[in-house]
Amino acid sequence: MYTVKENVSKEAIEEFLQSRKLTLDVPYQFSLGLFENSRLQGVLLYEDSLWESKVLQKKVMNVKLLAANSTGQLKRLFEAFYTVRQMDETDFIFVRVPAEDIGAAHVIQQQPSSYFVGSLLKLAMPPSFYDKTPPFFELGPPEPGDTEAICELARDSFTKSRYFQDPHLSRDAANEIFQEWTRNNLNGRAAVNIVAKHNGEVIGYLQGLSRDDECILDLMAVKPGFEGKRIAFHLLANLIEQPETQKHRTVTAGTQLHNVRAIRLYERMGFTAEQSYYYYHIWPGKEAK
């Protein structure tokens, strides 16, 4: 007899994940557990994505981790979660599935109005230093007057991302996500903001986060017309060589599996692939495809 319960204890979740040889590398807000005779058989960790909800004017949920001892149990757990999301009028659910978890991917693909919206490759490396010639542009922290130019550069710079692949999100909505994401980072979310300027013009930017012993490349963009001029290399090298970054154990970056240019840059700079994921958006209120 299966039962689904909310608010599973942190200790029970950690014990279950250890039994599955899984690690939790992201924070979460809520938990849902599938139990059989009082034994935990599966967990679903999720959060209200308040920031996305505000920008898109939609109710958005992010599933941070989904795991069970069998595909059947995982399906039972996710369908219980999905039913509640239908009742509380959630607009869309974002689910990240490890690429090797074929069972989980199959369960998500079977849901009504489920859309594959991309894939992510996570790469990592220890902090290091680089031999490099001085760039033809200036690098440094942004000035207050740079904000709008940086946010405008975010427009159409991330078209390979999941938001642009969702048929229920307009191009303008996807662009607004990244412009407000960039602005939020400039307003204090990011631990590091770096801007590249040429003759006073913003031609690139990078934003990095700090989480425990990990420095995370969050956003990076180069102005059209300046690609192939090593701007991204110098931005990333500048981040990695920051004194605060050097205190971290690893530097991580993520990009879409089909973003070959970005992957080649990261590999040339010493990053190695660590994990890959499939991304899905599910719209509980939409009609089935």
Swiss-Prot record:
Alphabetized Pfam families for the sequence: Acetyltransf_1 (PF00583)
Pathway: Spore coat biogenesis; spore coat polysaccharide biosynthesis
InterPro entries documented for this protein: Acyl_CoA_acyltransferase, GNAT_dom, MshD_Acetyltransferase
EC numbers on record: 2.3.1.-
Keywords from the UniProt entry: Acyltransferase, Transferase
Superkingdom, natural source: Bacteria
MF annotations from Gene Ontology: acyltransferase activity, transferring groups other than amino-acyl groups
Ranges for domain N-acetyltransferase: 137-289
PANTHER family referenced in this protein's UniProt entry, alphabetically: L-AMINO ACID N-ACETYLTRANSFERASE, SPORE COAT POLYSACCHARIDE BIOSYNTHESIS PROTEIN SPSD
Name listed for the protein in its UniProt record: Spore coat polysaccharide biosynthesis protein SpsD
